[in-house]
């Protein structure tokens, strides 16, 4: 550039030109520097690559050398191995040749097999064609025979008609009264006998016998149509029942057991009515007449004794209860037979009718006999060997031979047949469902040795059951609804109209037939909607609300009723509500606990009731003065309510929910109180932040009220016991501040009765937006600070200016949205302190609670600073339980202990065991309860800051995070942690397990299964996990439930409801045991025992049973048999014991001489004795001599040996098949004594509760006295110290009346509660099955009924001083 010579004109600006060139020079230098840098980088990269290339070259040279050496070595080896390779080659060639030869041989064999199979298939096809041809010919022949029999039957029908005309010509009036109902009247259950029957003469009797024999003899035993059978049935029955021998007595008798043995047990054979004649000559004349009438007629009828029979078509066993009912309705005209019994006949002897028992027992028995279990579906049980053959006459055998000779023997169909030993067990079971007769001596000794059925609860009752209350349930809309959680007392809900009840408590209620004949049934009363039962003098008892749809003839729709409910326009109360009302209500009677329909009138502060509206001019049957001491309590599900006066309690309900609400609203307005109901916390279960007595002042009016701050709403109540508030005040965005006075003068307070607050009271004002201010007068400064702080936080104001210093720091952190870099996290107030506290960290409403907070901190310090050792772990268990129990008793301290533990875990010096034990105590707190609002936010933030999977403290923080989230989802606990829970946290690392605790669950067969759970697991979650692991269905299908044993060691079990926490149940059990055994050491060796047993049994769920369910059901049934609560005779007891022995111990090993290969006789004898003790009824062995016991063991050995090779599932199937033949299989039996009998008589009965109803069984024979279906049960539960059952019988068709019966039984209190809850569960399950509810309010689930009885005396709020 220096060489360039630029000739520029004089006008060029050289200065600018110089600057431009300097700028370009600067740019060139920058580019040059960049180029140098890039060049240097490139050179360095190339140098690096050069070094790497040189390194790779050296490595390659090294590898080349190595490979050359390997090649040299391999060449040497190849030279040596050429000979061995040649030998291997030759060996492989030989092996290939051998394989080829084997393949050729197999191919040849395959071809031969193919040819053989083709020939066999051809042969089978030929045989099938022959069989088909034979079947076709046989069917044609049978069809021809059927036509012949039909024509023959038609002739016989004509003969029957002529003979009937002849019989009618013989005027035998007395005997006509005993005629069997015709085919059209099959719905009648029985025909009562007439007392005025005149005996007939001998000649006329003989003539009638001959005529009847002529009618009955020619009945063929072939398959007939329904029409032909029905045509022949009615005249046959008329003629067969028109003759009564001289001196005979006709009476109604229940069905005998032998009827069930003449056909398979699962058929409804008990519906066949059998008439017997007591004269021996009757049968002889009948057989002679038969032989004389049709000498050449072939018949397939088999006779089962004297008399003749009808041939009936084959029918299927009813598969549903409806089929059973239909068969039961037509049993008079068309008896049924079992599967495959075409030629089996039914005797119609003339001795007595088998009348149906009024209790419904035959229906149960027929249902049990007709029920087929899934294990033997589509199978047929053969009759017992030697049973039916003995009853068959030679003529019947000849008839069978003639039937077989009709053609060639057909091929045997491939039907399932039981093995011999299985058939033997079923044969024994047909007659074995009863108790064997025992000698008086052994029976007396057995009864004396058995524990008494009615025992007093003893000392255990005073400790655990001291607050147990047996509830009372009633049937409302088909569901069991609790109307009282206390037993009924005779004087409760009493009234003047109850005094007219009869002593026997049997009251008549007219039915619709009697109403129509009543003179009071005017059309005007009908149009008014007034029930005729309420107008008549006999209408004391109303239709229960579950069946409360009044007859259409006597009621109108609700919007048309004019007299069932009416208001008065006089005397309007608050808000315009009428304080006078009249209408119909259903009232529970005092003696017979059933619903009575009464006309109630509310007037002038009194409520009176009459029998009908027309009786209002008379003296009322009862009246209640409504004053301030009266109380209204809603019942379960808001279907009933209680009116509690000073003297009595009235249980009331209405015809509809709307009428019920109207009455409650009017009564509330009159009493100026809200109806209390079941305890229900507001806002979805949120507990109050702060509560206490305050004086509320608004518009110059003051009132002392009980106040509670729940969430963002301020509630105030009349008293602390009320569940419904007088009013509420929204606090969100309200202005909260402290003022000097809320009124102008002290005289206002004096007039309001608040003189004690004048000198020292503090005042807060709540001024919501768009509302007038409300003033709160508070007695002490501590209370004022507490209310001010919590109201300010609820209002959404800044909490950094109210509360303690600790709370203000938390408020500042919340205002900063929890900034992790904020220096406030390391503030000394929030961090670890070696010294003790001088004041509480949170605002507490009283000095006593502040003192308790300081003591709580000292307890925590002792727990943290003393090292945990396994030998002395009970010291830390006691400290943790005591500290947490104080927090449960005083919820105000729950946030305090969280703040104390958070303070001691933050910025703590690395002293391992102290920090770990602090986190352990926090891990015990998290499942129990949670802090309030902003404290909960602070705890979550701290846990998030400390969570770290790499350190042990970080893993504890993660565990606490999970525990806090679980507590938020499932709710808080009720009891302090148990010893098992504390020890598991202290000695095991809970963060290593998702379920840190585990406990064994015991089954009825002696096994157990260990199940894991956490601190928030409920019983439902626990059972869901258990069912998944052992292969069972959910409890609503299987009927199983979880039970605990009794802390006292007595033979009592407690069912756990589904919402109970497992840890709470264990803790309450431990507390109860400590109260029972106060002298024992803290770490007792005995722990709670959980049992999984069947509680409810549903026949509709049998098809889905799993193998584990069947095993447990069989084991539980075996225990019932051993305890004497299952009726089986001695022979069947041995069969059942042998089956259970095969399940439990497998095949029986025969005793041999002592040696390595056999079982010693002593060991075998011990095994047999063990089987007898576990599976054989005690009553059959008690007091028996040694020789008899040896004989029993020998018989058991014989029966057990026949089960050789039978698998346990097969034995269980047979066991349950036999056990289910008893109609009350799965029912729960309770020993009770009827209260009508004196205690000296000691006549015990069994109360059997199952899904069909409640049955009363004889205590000795276990035979049914009577059965009450749930549809007839009106009220049940506790009555004083006894069990009460109120029954409404089905109206009698003849008289049109039903009866109300009140039954009282003496039982122990736990058994009364268990029976009551099981009945309620069955009733509600049946209702849910028929009509699934749409989640009615207040409806309890199936498994939540009996949880109220569990350890009620050990509540969380016990033994703690009131520090407020």
From Swiss-Prot:
Keyword tRNA processing annotated: no
Modification Phosphoserine occurs at: 745
What's the protein called, per UniProt?
A: Pleckstrin homology domain-containing family H member 1
Instruction: List the lineage, top down.
Output: Eukaryota, Metazoa, Chordata, Craniata, Vertebrata
Q: Does the keyword Iron apply?
A: no
Gene Ontology annotations for the cellular component aspect, listed alphabetically: cytoskeleton
Q: Where is the PH domain?
A: 578-672, 687-796
InterPro entries in the record: Band_41_domain, FERM/acyl-CoA-bd_prot_sf, FERM_2, FERM_central, FERM_domain, MyTH4_dom, MyTH4_dom_sf, PH-like_dom_sf
Give the span(s) annotated as Disordered.
Answer: 184-266, 296-321, 356-395, 487-529, 546-568
Q: Which UniProt keywords apply?
A: Coiled coil, Phosphoprotein, Repeat
| FERM domain: residues covered | 997-1333
- Per the database entry, which stretches of residues form a coiled coil? 28-169
Organism field: Homo sapiens (Human)
PANTHER family xref list: PLECKSTRIN HOMOLOGY DOMAIN-CONTAINING FAMILY H MEMBER 1 (PTHR22903:SF4), PLEKHH PROTEIN (PTHR22903)
Per the UniProt record, one Pfam family is RA_2
Gene3D superfamilies reported for this sequence: 1.20.80.10, MyTH4 domain (1.25.40.530), Phosphatidylinositol 3-kinase Catalytic Subunit, Chain A, domain 1 (3.10.20.90), Pleckstrin-homology domain (PH domain)/Phosphotyrosine-binding domain (PTB) (2.30.29.30)
């Amino acid at each position: 550039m220096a060489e360039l010579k630029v000739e520029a004109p004089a006008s060029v600006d050289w200065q600018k030109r110089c600057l431009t060139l300097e700028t370009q020079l600067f740019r060139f230098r920058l580019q040059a520097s960049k180029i140098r840098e890039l060049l240097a980088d490139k050179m360095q990269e190339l140098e690096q690559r050069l070094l790497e290339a040189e390194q790779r070259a050296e490595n390659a040279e090294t590898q080349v050398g190595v490979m050359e050496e390997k090649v040299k070595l391999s060449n040497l080896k190849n030279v040596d191995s050429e000979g061995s390779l040649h030998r291997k080659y030759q060996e492989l060639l030989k092996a290939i040749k051998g394989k080829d030869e084997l393949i050729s041989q197999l191919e040849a064999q395959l071809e031969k097999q193919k040819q053989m199979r083709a020939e066999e298939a051809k042969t089978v096809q030929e045989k099938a064609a022959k069989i088909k041809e034979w079947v076709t010919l046989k069917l044609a022949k049978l069809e021809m025979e059927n036509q012949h029999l039909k024509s023959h039957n038609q002739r016989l029908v004509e003969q029957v008609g002529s003979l009937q005309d002849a019989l009618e010509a013989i005027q035998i009036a007395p005997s006509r009264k005993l005629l069997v109902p015709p085919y059209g009247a099959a719905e009648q259950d029985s025909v009562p006998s007439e007392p005025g029957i005149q005996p007939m003469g001998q000649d006329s009797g003989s003539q009638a016998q001959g005529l009847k024999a002529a009618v009955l003899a020619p009945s063929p035993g072939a398959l007939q149509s329904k029409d032909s059978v029905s045509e022949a049935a009615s005249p046959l029955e008329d003629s067969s029942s028109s003759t009564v021998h001289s001196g005979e007595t006709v009476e109604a008798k229940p069905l005998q057991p032998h009827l069930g043995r003449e056909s398979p047990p699962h058929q409804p054979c008990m519906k066949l009515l059998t008439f017997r004649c007591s004269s021996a000559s009757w049968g002889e004349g009948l057989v002679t007449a038969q032989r004389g009438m049709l000498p050449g007629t072939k018949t397939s009828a088999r006779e089962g004794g004297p008399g003749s029979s009808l041939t009936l078509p084959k029918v299927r066993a009813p598969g549903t209860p409806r089929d059973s009912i239909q068969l039961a309705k037509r049993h008079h005209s068309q008896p049924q037979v079992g599967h495959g019994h075409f030629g089996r006949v039914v005797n119609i002897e003339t001795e007595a009718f088998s009348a149906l028992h009024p209790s419904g027992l035959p229906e149960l028995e027929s249902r049990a006999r007709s029920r087929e279990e899934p294990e033997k579906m589509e199978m047929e049980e053969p009759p017992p060997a030697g049973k039916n053959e003995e009853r068959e006459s030679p003529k019947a055998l000849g008839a069978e031979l003639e039937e077989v000779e009709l053609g060639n023997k057909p091929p045997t169909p491939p039907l399932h047949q039981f093995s011999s030993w299985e058939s033997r067990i079923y044969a024994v079971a047909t007659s074995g469902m009863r108790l064997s007769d025992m000698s008086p001596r052994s029976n007396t000794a057995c009864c004396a040795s058995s524990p008494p059925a009615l025992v007093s609860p003893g000392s255990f009752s005073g400790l655990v059951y001291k607050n147990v209350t047996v509830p009372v349930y009633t049937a409302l809309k088909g569901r069991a609804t609790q109307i009282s959680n206390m037993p009924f007392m005779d004087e409760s809900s009493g009234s003047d109209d109850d005094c007219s009840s009869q002593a026997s408590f049997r009251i008549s209620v007219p039915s619709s037939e009697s109403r129509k004949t009543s003179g009071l049934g005017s059309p005007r009363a009908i149009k008014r909607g007034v029930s005729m039962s309420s107008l008549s003098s006999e209408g004391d008892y109303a239709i229960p609300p579950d069946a409360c749809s009044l007859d259409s003839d006597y009621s109108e729709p609700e919007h048309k009723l004019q007299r069932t409910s009416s208001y008065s326009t006089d005397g309007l109360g608050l808000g315009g509500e009428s304080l006078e009302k009249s209408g119909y209500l259903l009232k529970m009677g005092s003696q017979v606990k059933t619903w009575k329909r009464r006309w109630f009138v509310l007037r002038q502060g009194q409520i009176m009731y009459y029998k009908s509206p027309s009786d209002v001019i008379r003296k009322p049957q009862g009246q209640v003065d409504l004053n301030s001491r009266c109380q209204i309590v809603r019942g379960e599900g808001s279907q009933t309510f209680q009116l509690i006066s000073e003297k009595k309690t009235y249980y009331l309900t209405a015809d509809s929910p709307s009428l019920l609400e109207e009455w409650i609203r009017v009564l509330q307005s009159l009493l100026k109180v809200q109806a209390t109901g079941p305890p229900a916390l507001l806002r979805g279960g949120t507990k109050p932040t702060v509560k206490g007595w305050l004086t509320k002042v608004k518009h110059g009016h003051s009132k002392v009220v009980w106040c509670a701050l729940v969430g963002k709403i301020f509630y105030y109540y009349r008293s602390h016991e009320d569940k419904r508030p007088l009013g509420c005040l929204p606090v969100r965005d309200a202005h909260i501040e402290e003022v000097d006075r809320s009124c102008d003068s002290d005289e206002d307070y004096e007039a309001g009765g608040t003189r004690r607050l004048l000198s020292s009271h503090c005042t807060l004002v709540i001024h919501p937006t768009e509302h007038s201010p409300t003033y709160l007068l508070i007695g002490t400064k501590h209370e004022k600070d507490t209310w001010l702080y919590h109201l300010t936080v609820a209002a959404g104001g800044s909490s950094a200016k109210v509360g303690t210093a600790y709370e203000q720091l938390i408020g500042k952190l919340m205002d900063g949205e929890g900034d992790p870099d904020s220096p406030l996290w390391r503030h000394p107030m929030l961090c670890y302190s070696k010294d003790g506290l001088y004041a509480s960290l949170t605002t507490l409403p009283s000095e006593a609670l502040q003192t308790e907070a300081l003591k709580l901190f000292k307890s925590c310090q002792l727990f943290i600073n003393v090292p945990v050792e396994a030998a002395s772990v009970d010291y830390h268990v006691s400290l943790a339980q005591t500290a947490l129990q104080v927090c449960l008793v005083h919820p105000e301290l729950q946030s305090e202990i969280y703040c104390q533990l958070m303070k001691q875990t933050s910025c703590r010096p690395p002293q391992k065991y102290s920090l770990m034990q602090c986190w352990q105590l926090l891990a015990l707190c998290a499942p129990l309860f949670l802090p309030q609002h902003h404290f909960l936010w602070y705890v979550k933030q701290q846990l998030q800051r400390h969570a770290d999977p790499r350190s042990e403290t970080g893993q504890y923080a993660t565990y606490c995070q999970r525990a806090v989230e679980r507590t938020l989802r499932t709710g808080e606990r009720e009891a302090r942690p148990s010893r098992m829970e504390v020890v598991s946290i202290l000695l095991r690392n809970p963060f290593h397990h998702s379920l840190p605790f585990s406990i064994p669950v015991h089954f009825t067969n002696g096994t157990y299964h260990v199940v894991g759970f956490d601190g928030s697991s409920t019983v439902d979650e626990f059972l869901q996990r258990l069912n998944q692991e052992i292969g069972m269905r959910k409890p609503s299908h299987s009927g199983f439930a979880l039970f605990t044993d009794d802390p006292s060691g007595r033979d009592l079990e407690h069912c756990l409801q589904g919402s109970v926490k497992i840890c709470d149940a264990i803790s309450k059990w431990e507390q109860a045991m400590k109260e029972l055994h106060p002298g024992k050491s803290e770490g007792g060796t005995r722990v709670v025992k959980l049992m999984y047993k069947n509680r409810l049994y549903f026949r509709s769920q049998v098809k889905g049973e799993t193998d584990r369910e069947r095993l447990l059901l069989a084991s539980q049934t075996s225990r019932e048999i051993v305890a004497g609560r299952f009726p089986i005779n001695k022979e069947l007891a041995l069969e059942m014991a042998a089956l259970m022995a095969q399940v439990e111990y497998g095949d029986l090993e025969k005793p041999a001489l002592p040696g390595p290969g056999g079982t010693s006789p002593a060991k075998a004898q011990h095994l047999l004795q063990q089987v007898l003790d576990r599976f054989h009824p005690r009553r059959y062995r008690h007091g028996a001599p040694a020789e008899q016991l040896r004989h029993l063991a020998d018989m058991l050995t014989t029966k057990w040996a026949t089960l050789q090779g039978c698998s346990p599932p097969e034995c269980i199937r047979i066991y349950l098949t036999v056990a289910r033949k008893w109609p009350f299989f799965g029912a729960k039996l309770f020993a009770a004594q009827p209260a009508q009998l004196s205690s000296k008589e000691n006549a015990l009965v069994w109360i059997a509760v199952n899904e069909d109803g409640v049955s009363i069984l004889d205590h000795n024979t276990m035979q049914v006295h009577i059965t009450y279906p749930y549809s007839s049960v009106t009220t049940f539960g506790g009555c004083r110290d006894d069990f009460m059952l109120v029954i409404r019988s089905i109206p009698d068709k003849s008289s049109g009346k039903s009866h109300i019966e009140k039954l009282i039984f003496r039982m122990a209190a736990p058994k009364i509660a268990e029976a009551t809850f099981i009945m309620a569960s069955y009733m509600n399950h049946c209702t849910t099955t028929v009509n699934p509810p749409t989640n009615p309010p207040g409806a309890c689930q199936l498994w939540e009924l009996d949880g109220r009885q569990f350890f009620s005396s050990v509540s969380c709020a016990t033994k703690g001083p009131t520090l407020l």
